[in-house]
Amino acid sequence: MAVSSSQSQPAKAAVLLHEVSAQQLAQAYDRNTVAADQQFKGKRFKVTGTVDSINTDMFGNPYITLRGGVNQFMEPQFELKKSHANYAATLQRGMRISLICTGGGDIAKIPMSQNCVPDA
């Protein structure tokens, strides 16, 4: 039985990947940070949204903001793996994209996600 469970586990993980829009993610953190952390922080999920900006942090890591925040200054942020910098370079504001990310909690109610990769 244990062998059967472990064999089916990878397939279940792919099927159970939580899907959310950037707006739903932002609203979840705006409503209740503790509940949103329990749902997203440290977990992989698929997020879809419209690119608002493409940036680099102070360490040169590329990150994207997607529209959907509770206001224009609180758009959710998605840090890409450095190996996907070329992907970030192809993006333009207004493009609709999907990413697979790990939730990183929030900073002042702004949802932060990390280790993001483009959804194939």
Briefly describe each language-model feature range.
Residues M1-A120:
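OB-fold and OB-like single-stranded nucleic-acid-recognition modules
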